[in-house]
């Protein structure tokens, strides 16, 4: 009978509001490990402190008494666990390191045997969970321009049924040559896919990747804005997508691009969740009948005053506007309750801002951009906002309505 041995090593990655991070290293053995005998001191991941070790039945399974997988939980406070780093050219760099793992002492198996120690074995695989469920592809427009994108499809598609699609557009700081950057920079794309995976609100999720700035403070956009709408139209023809439930959301530059797409393509989006961005108040009045929820920080020196002016202009033109401010540090239940209260007023335009510096975590130095950047780290965590988006749908003659 063969002696127990190590089979392979995998690094686990989780999406996070502040950027994807490596959370654990998983060692697969040929035989079941005895969990109660495991000690984190028996292992080493070079350069990455371990805070716990446990056995499980699957790579991402819960703690088990015995299991063929040993999860080495990494210290989340270690900056090296973060995959996203800002490069010298102010472009997002994605780091996918190969971790080196050592088992210092023999490991007790459930059979009574031992797995021999090993030194400096490489983690050859990276399991990024829901991020890996996105396919990566490219689209060529009618004018010959190429746009790369990530697309999540519902795990179970019922024949004859159509599903909503969520378009997520990233910020300027996430511009990168790495097509997966929109999925790794935060949760603006992955949160919808994760809920779909759990069977809640199944949907498609589209996350294009832009390599350069596509919208500026002069309210100008590049060809990528029209190309993204063309891509959406193409996907609607290829997949079981409900054209009455095309949703858009974006942060900073992404918010700005969606505003322009909305102006150029009225009645295209059923609703838009716009985070930490602003657009031309002189033109936004034309979108008075669109369905929007705008979330900014009260300390955001651009997004707060400019988008408020735009929304007031939309109200003056005939739109129905509801406003509220919330403390970003309130617990999840309170934030959901506040958003639902605002939603109950049945406005097609909603404006919510985070009070004071509440969006900025303690311990972080406050500078001009912190209110801005921290907004989307919080906004996509609010379940009631995600629920609101999926309640909307188009009907003949426009304004989107609740299901």
Language-model regions: role of each:
Residues 237-238, 243-288:
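Primarily recognizes the serine-hydrolase "nucleophile elbow" in alpha/beta-hydrolase
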Residues 163-165, 172-229:
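Active-site machinery of serine-nucleophile hydrolases
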């Amino acid at each position: 009978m063969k002696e127990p041995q190590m089979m392979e090593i995998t690094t686990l990655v989780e999406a996070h509001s502040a950027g994807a991070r490596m959370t654990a290293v998983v060692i697969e053995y040929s035989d079941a490990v005895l969990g109660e005998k495991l000690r984190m001191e028996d292992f080493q991941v070079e350069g990455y402190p371990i805070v716990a070790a446990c056995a499980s039945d699957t790579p991402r399974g819960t703690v088990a008494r015995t299991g063929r997988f040993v999860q080495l939980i990494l210290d989340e406070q270690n900056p090296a666990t973060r995959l996203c780093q800002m490069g010298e050219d102010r472009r997002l760099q994605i780091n996918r390191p190969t971790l080196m793992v050592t088992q210092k002492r023999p490991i007790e198996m459930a059979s009574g045997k031992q797995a021999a120690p090993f030194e400096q074995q490489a983690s050859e695989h990276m399991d990024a969970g829901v991020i890996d469920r996105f396919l990566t592809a490219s689209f060529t427009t009618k004018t010959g321009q190429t746009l790369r994108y990530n697309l999540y499809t519902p795990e179970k598609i019922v024949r004859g049924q159509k599903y909503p699609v969520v378009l997520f557009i990233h910020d300027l700081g996430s511009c990168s040559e790495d097509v997966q950057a929109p999925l790794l920079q935060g949760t603006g794309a992955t949160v919808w896919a994760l809920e779909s995976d759990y069977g809640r609100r199944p949907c498609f999720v589209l996350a294009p990747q832009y390599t350069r700035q596509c919208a500026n403070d002069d309210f100008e956009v590049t060809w990528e804005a029209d190309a993204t709408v063309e891509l959406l139209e193409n996907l609607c023809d290829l997949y079981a997508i409900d054209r009455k439930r095309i949703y858009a959301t974006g942060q900073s530059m992404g918010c700005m691009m969606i505003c322009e797409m909305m102006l150029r393509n009225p009645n295209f989006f059923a609703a838009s969740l716009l985070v930490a961005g602003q657009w031309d108040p002189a033109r936004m009045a034309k979108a008075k009948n669109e369905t929007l929820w705008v979330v900014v920080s009260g300390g955001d020196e651009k997004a707060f005053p400019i988008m408020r002016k735009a929304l007031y202009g939309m109200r003056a033109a005939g739109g129905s506007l509801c406003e509220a401010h919330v403390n970003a540090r309130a617990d999840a239940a309170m934030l959901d309750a506040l958003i639902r209260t605002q939603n109950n007023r049945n406005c097609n335009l909603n404006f919510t801002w985070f009070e004071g510096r509440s969006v900025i975590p303690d311990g972080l130095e406050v500078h001009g951009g912190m209110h801005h950047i921290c907004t989307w780290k919080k906004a996509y965590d609010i379940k009631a906002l995600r629920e609101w988006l999926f309640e909307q749908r188009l009907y003949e003659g426009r304004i989107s309505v609740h299901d």
